[in-house]
Amino acid sequence: MKMWKDTVRQCIFLKPAHISLYSLQIEEGTEFYELYKDGKMEAVPEIQDREMYHQALAMMKEAGYMHYEISNAALPGFESRHNLKYWSYAEYLGLGLGASSFAGGSRFKNTSRMHEYLTAIREHVPPVDQESIENYSQREEMGIFVFTGLRKAEGFSLDHFHHVFRRSEEHTSELQSHEP
């Protein structure tokens, strides 16, 4: 834990405007996986991982950082606008090869093939990979709204939920019954 605290202190000392915290995922096909598999590296126990996370958040808060999203903290005014749009169920347009978008109720990606991308641009058509288009039922979209909204420290607004899905409060009474 001392090494972790020292690392967080060094990060805070550098005063970046934004800090992201992610737990290491040991995945097959990576160098870390090989080290782990060969017994040359240990995985951090889940309880210790959570302690490290909460310790870092406390240290960052003390240094003036605001924990605004499950894995991000920022100095006031430096929150990631893209992340907040995503977690707030706002539309966004991805530009470039393989970029993701959410617009008009659909989720889609641009082609990641340069030739197809350039051809589409020259022909003035969207460079969307047609196989990537995802349209969900309203019930599924409601679940996505809740799930992504819960990534934010403030959670999500039922008023915003009602507005997005044009639902009256009676339709969301089930959601409210699950509040702590």
Model-inferred region functions:
Residues 170-180:
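Single conserved hydrophobic/aromatic residue that forms the stacking wall/gate
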Residues 1-167:
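C-terminal scaffold of the Radical SAM
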